[in-house]
């Protein structure tokens, strides 16, 4: 009986507080609003499984929570919704990816490295790459 009480106290200490949940929700809403502004005026196309190395090398990379945008010029953006533990609204990690080919493809793993400590802090898998283009 005593161990059950102790276990319930330990588990209760691990649960997020109401304030922490509200802060996380506010950060997510802010990130979603920034993402919507970044894609404003762009039209999504059919999803692609891979992003060529040419597009990737010429891209400016922006992250919004678990979504990564590869901005190739003014009129073309590739959106990737990462799977796994890449939803970071509080830190700006370094993404390290080792690919078996010259393309970055769905299912490739990205390891997250903390900029300050240079220690690994997580990993996740890339999803489909959705091209967004500006209507002319």
Q: Model-derived features: where do they sit?
A:
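Sec-dependent signal peptide recognition
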Residues: 1-7
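C-terminal motif of bacterial Sec signal peptides marking the signal peptidase cleavage site
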Residues: 11-13
């Amino acid at each position: 009986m005593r161990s059950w009480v102790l276990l319930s106290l330990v588990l209760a200490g691990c649960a997020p507080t109401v304030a922490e949940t509200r802060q996380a929700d506010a950060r997510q809403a802010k990130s979603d609003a920034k993402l919507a502004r970044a894609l404003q005026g762009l039209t999504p196309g059919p999803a692609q499984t891979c992003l060529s190395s040419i597009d990737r090398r010429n891209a400016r990379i922006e992250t919004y929570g678990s979504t990564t945008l590869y901005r190739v010029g003014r009129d073309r953006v590739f959106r990737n919704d990462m799977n796994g533990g890449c939803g970071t609204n509080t830190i700006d990690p370094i993404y390290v990816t080792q690919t078996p080919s010259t393309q970055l493809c769905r299912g490739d793993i990205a390891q997250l490295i903390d900029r300050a400590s240079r220690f690994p802090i997580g990993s996740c898998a890339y999803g489909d790459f959705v091209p967004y283009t500006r209507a002319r």
